[in-house]
Amino acid sequence: AKDLDAFAKRVARLPLKFQPGSKYHYSIAVDITGLVVQRISGMTFDEYLQDNIFAPLGMKDTFFEVPRSARERFLPNYFFDPESGKPVDISLAPPPLNSRKNVAMQDYASVSLYSGGGGLVSTAMDYARFAEAMRNGGSLNGLRILGPKTVDYISTNHLSAGSGLAGFGEQPGVEAVDSVLGFGLGFGVVTDTTKTDVVGSVGEYN
């Protein structure tokens, strides 16, 4: 899809897996949340993130579309070529891989689909600043982007007892412990370390 509006229209044509509120299944809901932010704020999702999260936290190297001045520091995306057994720069790959446009994970130089669920590129230092702000309850160096109660709420498990991260079967090790990995508002939450192979602490979110 060329942008979030077109993406949401395509998603809306798909049949429901089940009635909303009756079950939990990991989904693309957070992708659609980006469109909700656009509609409420009157800004594009990338503009909203820049003005309300990245700039206040001093995250100068986090973008959907990498500016030309920063591209020499940006590593290209690679895919594994089974024929040669080697990684290949996706920009040098034959069609149809190199012809896909406006896909944030591939075409970082020309992006129009600002997804709520993925596509940002960043640096370890920028991400550390964001993580530290979350660890501090929504603030960094005296600048607040979220209230402490909001951080607590979004990082608390909101699934009913017995529900877990269903839908992650394609990721090794997760399906077996999905009943003890809860989900907040955009974060997976550890609810019981005695029944999981995931190393962590109760209440940990990621």
What do these predicted ranges mean?
Residues 1-196:
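Short, surface-exposed loop or secondary-structure junction motifs
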